[in-house]
Design a protein with these regions (language model features):
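Active-site catalytic motif of lipid deacylating hydrolases and related acyltransferases
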Residues: 1-74
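A structural micro-motif
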Residues: 4, 40, 72, 98-101, ...
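Hydrophobic/aromatic beta-strand patches that form the interior of the parallel beta-sheet core
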Residues: 7, 43, 104, 168-170, ...
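Serine-dependent carboxylesterase/thioesterase catalytic core
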Residues: 10, 42, 54-159, 199
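Short, solvent-exposed loop/turn segments at secondary-structure junctions
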Residues: 12-14, 48-50, 83, 109-111, ...
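Short aromatic-enriched loop/helix-cap "lid" or pocket-rim segments at secondary-structure transitions
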Residues: 19-21, 113-119, 124, 178-183
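Glycine-rich, phosphate-binding/catalytic loops in enzymes
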Residues: 23-26, 92-95, 120-122, 186, ...
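C-terminal catalytic-base region of ester-bond hydrolases, centering on the histidine
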Residues: 162-259
């Protein structure tokens, strides 16, 4: 069992489970329950789904600090924007860095996201995105602006991380994910435009960061990294015949074994 609290930090448009209640829908699909069954202490805080990195990072640090026992440390497993939130908190929230042992970022746009750039600049790529995603981000500009390439470049210059914390970065490779992907069309277009492996939202070059231990790309798109694929929307008796079984829980077990 991991020594310390495992925190699952959600990305933009995401949600937590701060009370730890059973739920039919979780941002990290089935991960919290799976880790609890293995005996780990898990916390899924809620931050503003549309907020800026600064707002979300402060909320993340506050939520974690409220539940940590005296002397206890935490291991943050963050998806997408959640990784930027955690980085902000570690640098800017007084004393928070002393309570964190590990930061794992999964599909985090450390150098920005081509999807955010596309929505801001209204390029052809934005037309390939789900309408609910573009509409929500356009209405809530805090998160959208902070995820652009230019904004993340500034964030990286002003956010100097502590080398005392173990840091792990995981990219996604939608091209290896098979036909159960949700974002396969977007991932293919990003690959054509950038020439990079990507998960349909974040390129591998952006998901990896200097000073972090780099894991091999997960064969999934951005949604699949947290367990959401076509499996999630059809009865098991159908998907088990036509789609490969979901494997994301094993990926999280791999991470937890490193903590």
């Amino acid at each position: 069992m991991v020594d310390g609290l495992i925190v699952l930090a959600h990305g933009v448009l995401g949600f937590g489970n701060p009370l730890g209640l059973p739920s039919l829908v979780n941002y990290f699909n089935g991960v919290e329950e799976h880790l609890r069954q293995e005996g780990h202490q898990v916390f899924s805080p809620q931050v503003n789904p549309f907020g800026s990195i600064a707002q979300r990072g402060a909320e993340l640090a506050s939520a974690i600090s409220r539940v940590l026992a005296d002397g206890q440390k935490t291991h943050i497993i963050a998806h997408s924007m959640g990784g930027l939130d955690a980085r902000y908190a570690l640098v800017n929230v007084p004393g928070f860095v002393d309570r964190v042992a590990t930061l794992v970022t999964i599909g985090t746009p450390h150098r920005g996201s081509p999807v955010a750039d596309a929505i801001v600049n209204n390029t052809a790529l934005s037309a390939q995105l789900p309408s609910f995603l573009t509409e929500q981000l356009q209405r809530n500009a805090g998160a959208l602006h902070d995820l652009t390439t230019d904004s993340c470049a500034h964030f990286n210059q002003t956010t100097v991380e502590s080398s005392a914390i173990r840091r792990i970065a995981v990219p996604g490779d939608a091209s290896q994910g098979g036909h159960e992907l949700i974002l396969f069309q977007v991932a293919a277009l990003i690959g054509q435009l950038t020439g990079e492996v990507n998960d349909g939202v974040v390129t591998a070059g952006s998901a990896l960061r200097e000073g972090y231990t780099h894991l091999d790309p997960w064969p999934a798109d951005h949604a699949g990294e947290i367990g959401w694929s076509l499996h999630s929307f059809f009865p098991a008796q159908l998907t088990q015949r036509f789609l490969p079984p979901p494997t994301h829980l094993a990926w999280y077990d791999q991470i937890v074994a490193m903590l």
